[in-house]
Amino acid sequence: MKKKYKKLIILCKGDSVTGGSELVHQFCHELNSLSLDSSIAYYPLSEKYLVPEEYSIYDVKLSKLEDEHDNIIMLPEVATKFAYKIKTAKIAIWWLSVDNY
């Protein structure tokens, strides 16, 4: 089966240790364990972040927001404002909350 994308980049708030942030790290870890190229880009995008110590158990790669044709950029519902910055990549919105927006 041919992959329909080159890389999945999941946007996550930097320095955030919450249930939603942990879910993003778990998801990225599981995709990588299945040999699917996925990474996390922390925002604000102008800052540099490290993976929080609490999430060091997850195998995740960090990347920049790579707005390329073959990429998918997944945004949490609280960061849909970044959709306007993405011109080329495909966009997916992951609704991590039950009733928050």
Mark where each language-model region is.
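N-terminal pre-catalytic "stem/leader" segment of glycosyltransferase-like enzymes
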Residues: M1-I72
